[in-house]
Amino acid sequence: MDRKATVIDGKLAAQHVKDSLRTRVAALEAIGQRPGLGTILVGDDAGSQSYVAGKHRDCAEVGIDSFRIDMSAEASQERVLDAVGRLNEDERCSGFIVQLPLPAHIDMHLVLNAIDPEKDADGLHPVNLGRLVLNQEGTLPCTPRGILELLRGNDVPITGSQFCVIGCGTTVGRPLGLMLTRPSEHATVTMVNEATIDVAAHTRVADVVIAAAGVANLVKPYWIKPGATVLSVGITRTVEGILGDVDPGVENVAGKWTRAAGGVGPMTRAMLLKNVVELAERAAGITSEASTKIAS
């Protein structure tokens, strides 16, 4: 019988993260510094509503306070910026996120730039991305951080390995490439995008393929070197359900892989909690267990 790839369980890994955070949250609460997460949601997109609700459930699970600011899709840019300003000043809020995407009439970059970098729970403020480039301490983007924790937790070699990252977006691909090339990781990274000629030529020589393109079943089995590790990050909602960037047939070729559901997604949410706790620790003058120099 053909051997199937080992499934990397993101739900289990996320639960381990949550378990470890409860102790840190309790320690902060003991000194009157209970962490708090704020969310700003503009519009009624079903996917965004679900994501935000899940983040608040996660907070309750580990003892983090959470605060919601929800607005209609017609909310003005001024109203959104006002909400950002309020959370910047709210002492109960250790960190917050603006749920993306925003309606077309709102300048996403203007809104994200208005977030206090010391309350940037998503790690997407230009200051924090700049800190990542310079290998300085700062908040890391949630999905790339979760990916590295998944790889380490499943004994996937990083240093010296050949990575192929499919997709160069600001939330996953580009920051992931930066994190993989830090001195603490020292991986060799190839970034491919929609303009790349013969993407498969790059993936077939990679030890680890990370697909973050948002194109259903993009990565085919013949793209993968036997025994490689393959992570599916992007998702596409269809009438048949949620599809990942990786064709399920890859399971017959890869050594380890994540499915569309229960893989990278749970770790992204867990890393948001971890970022909030670290922001609260930093504000309280407690040395965090991790920094961008050494952390996943």
UniProtKB/Swiss-Prot annotation:
Q: Which UniProt keywords apply?
A: Amino-acid biosynthesis, Histidine biosynthesis, Hydrolase, Methionine biosynthesis, Multifunctional enzyme, NADP, One-carbon metabolism, Oxidoreductase, Purine biosynthesis
Q: Which GO terms describe its cellular component?
A: cytosol
The pathway entry for this protein reads as: One-carbon metabolism; tetrahydrofolate interconversion
EC numbers: 1.5.1.5, 3.5.4.9
An example GO BP is: methionine biosynthetic process
Its catalytic activity? (6R)-5,10-methylene-5,6,7,8-tetrahydrofolate + NADP(+) = (6R)-5,10-methenyltetrahydrofolate + NADPH; (6R)-5,10-methenyltetrahydrofolate + H2O = (6R)-10-formyltetrahydrofolate + H(+)
Q: Which SUPFAM superfamilies match?
A: Aminoacid dehydrogenase-like, N-terminal domain (SSF53223), NAD(P)-binding Rossmann-fold domains (SSF51735)
UniProt keyword Lipid metabolism present: no
Q: Which family is it part of?
A: Belongs to the tetrahydrofolate dehydrogenase/cyclohydrolase family.
Subunit-structure text: Homodimer.
- Can you name this protein? Bifunctional protein FolD 1
The protein's gene is named: folD1
